């Protein structure tokens, strides 16, 4: 696949702030760059169940989708994370039905949960990988691009920076918040 980067799951964090947020970290298959994606609690659970190979006594919501598409004759061939904007990642579910390919827009967390169930590959574009990957600061610390952080997390980080009197960081966060609000108008 030209200009695409194949991904695998590297890890998932425990709870972040806000309390129901998790960091799903995807890693390129051939290389070391990592892509952090903030997801909700239910989506994290749907992914974690597959990561630990737990078989629930009854199907979860994400388990129903493969059963349904199989019955309808469609197969998920891959997922593609095609866009990242203001901390939100956008993905396609790429299907094949009787030799015809079609795609459906999806939240990235749902796309990853389904890719695990279908055992199909996950991709992103090289542009997204370049702009959104974690930067290794050494000593087990990483820096996340400000563009990949949600508005809520930016506002909380701004308040924390002000409280700690870290005014240079606060001004960068304030500028990013303003820029995003202007784009929304």
Over which residues does each language-model region extend?
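Extended, charge-rich alpha-helical interface modules
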Residues: 182-185
């Amino acid at each position: 696949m030209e200009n695409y980067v194949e991904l695998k799951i590297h890890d998932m964090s425990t709870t972040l702030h806000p309390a129901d947020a998790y960091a799903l970290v995807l890693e390129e298959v051939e290389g070391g760059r990592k892509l952090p994606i903030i997801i909700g609690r239910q989506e994290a659970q749907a992914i974690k169940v597959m990561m630990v190979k737990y078989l629930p006594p009854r199907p979860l919501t994400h388990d129903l989708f493969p059963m349904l598409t199989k019955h309808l004759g469609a197969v998920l061939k891959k997922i593609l994370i095609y866009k990242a904007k203001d901390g939100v990642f956008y993905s396609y579910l790429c299907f094949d039905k009787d030799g015809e390919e079609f795609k459906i827009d999806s939240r990235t967390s749902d796309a990853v949960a389904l890719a695990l169930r279908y055992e199909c590959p996950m991709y992103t574009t090289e542009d997204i990988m370049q702009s959104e990957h974690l930067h290794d600061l050494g000593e087990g610390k990483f820096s996340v691009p400000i563009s990949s952080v949600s508005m809520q997390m930016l506002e909380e980080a701004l308040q924390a920076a002000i409280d700690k009197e870290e005014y240079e960081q606060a001004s960068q966060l304030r500028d990013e918040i303003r820029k995003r609000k202007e784009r929304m108008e």
